[in-house]
Amino acid sequence: NYSLGYPMTHGGWERDYVMRLVRKADFISWPKNIHSAPIVKGSTIKTTKAMEHHKDEGLSQMVRKTNRYSDIEATQFYDGKMAPVTSLTLIRKWWIESFRRGFLKRGLQDGKIGLIQSLYQGYSVFISYAKLYEKQRATK
């Protein structure tokens, strides 16, 4: 995975096994969940060769994607009857995701880009929960 033009070797982005190539005849459907995999007939295999994935060209693109995906995720959370969002929930979700990416998955070893990505992933999770809060508040 590349982000902002740099290869990501830590933080959970380094070995991203995603089904990328599917024979049309074996394709059944694709669930609407974020980061879901296609449903196919038969078995699947993992290749031994890596495929370059340039996930973000710039921060503006990242923010646009976050805004789009967080709308979907907040709706899924809301439809799943998630517990009410509190101030502590918002702080905790941001902090835990940033800590997980930066320290537990060693994203900070990727330098400044690892720091940016680790903090940004926390922000992305925060936005999803903030939008869930917005939905919960609107139905009171």
State each model region's role.
Residues 1-139:
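Catalytic-site signature of metal-activated, phosphate-bearing donor transferases
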